[in-house]
């Protein structure tokens, strides 16, 4: 068995005296592990850092085996990201989110979203809002997507300012007003599908904070609490730095 794909480094662990088990997020083969012989050498270590993108060739005798990687560098982001505390926590949180996906289950859209996020993680004006969007996309990839397109009560697609914590659906201002204390905020930038570089306007800190409140609630309900986990420290630190709460 053999395939070649690009891969974002999201983790590694020691294997034997000189090797590592490398965990990549790939567009065509999903989250995939493989052994890198000599991966702990001085030559290889800088390449195998979380946040880097590699060209990977995976080989194994059987499809279900761990297999081995041969890798070469494509985009080495780690050295750039190391200069930013926000970026370091961002890489750690992004990697932890991607590790929630089932192994070898392709999610090409999430891979592309992760690459966009990595490219902007050291930009404090953009990175926090992109992380909120990525968390929404990750929830959808896990089967817990939110419906923010129209009001759950009226079907209207304007004045959407709340989200129901029970259904994960948007609620309009008029329909939600009597229940506002029981609803989650829907910040305006999550209704805007534009992307950076094409007229996308950076949301203010208050809106980003509300975005993290929204995604954090559903991540807690569907991901962390069922696993008996608290909110990961790397997320808490990223949110604090990204919203001026540190």
Swiss-Prot record:
Highest taxon, organism lineage: Bacteria
Gene3D superfamilies reported for this sequence: Nucleic acid-binding proteins, Recombination protein O, C-terminal domain
Coiled coil regions in record: none
Keywords, sorted A to Z: DNA damage, DNA recombination, DNA repair
Annotated InterPro entries: ARFGAP/RecO, DNA_rep/recomb_RecO_N, NA-bd_OB-fold, RecO, RecO_C
Cellular component, GO annotation: bacterial nucleoid
An individual GO BP term: double-strand break repair
Physiological role: Involved in DNA repair and RecF pathway recombination.
Similarity section: Belongs to the RecO family.
Classification via HAMAP family: RecO
The protein, known as: DNA repair protein RecO
Species annotation: Methylorubrum extorquens (strain PA1)
């Amino acid at each position: 068995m053999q395939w070649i794909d690009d891969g974002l480094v999201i983790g590694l662990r020691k294997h034997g005296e000189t090797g590592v088990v490398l965990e990549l997020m790939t567009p065509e083969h999903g989250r995939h592990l493989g052994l890198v012989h000599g991966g702990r050498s001085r030559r290889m270590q800088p390449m195998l850092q979380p946040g880097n993108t590699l060209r990977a060739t995976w080989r194994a005798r059987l499809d279900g085996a761990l297999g081995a990687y041969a890798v070469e560098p494509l985009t080495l982001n780690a050295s750039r990201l190391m200069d930013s505390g926000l970026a370091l926590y961002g890489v750690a949180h992004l990697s932890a989110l991607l590790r929630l996906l089932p192994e070898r289950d392709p999610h090409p859209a999430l891979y592309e979203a992760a690459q966009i996020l990595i490219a902007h993680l050291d930009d404090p004006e953009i990175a926090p809002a992109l992380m909120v969007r990525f968390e929404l996309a990750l929830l959808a990839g896990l089967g817990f997507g939110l419906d923010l397109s129209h009001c759950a009560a009226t079907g209207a697609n304007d004045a959407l300012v709340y989200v129901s914590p029970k259904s994960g659906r948007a609620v309009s201002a008029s329909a939600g007003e009597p229940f506002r204390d029981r609803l989650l905020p829907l910040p305006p930038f999550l209704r805007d599908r534009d992307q950076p570089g094409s007229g996308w306007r950076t949301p203010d800190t208050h809106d980003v904070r509300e975005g993290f409140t929204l995604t954090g609630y559903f991540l807690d309900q569907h991901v962390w609490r069922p696993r008996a986990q608290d909110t990961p420290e790397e997320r808490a630190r990223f949110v604090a730095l990204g919203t001026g709460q540190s």
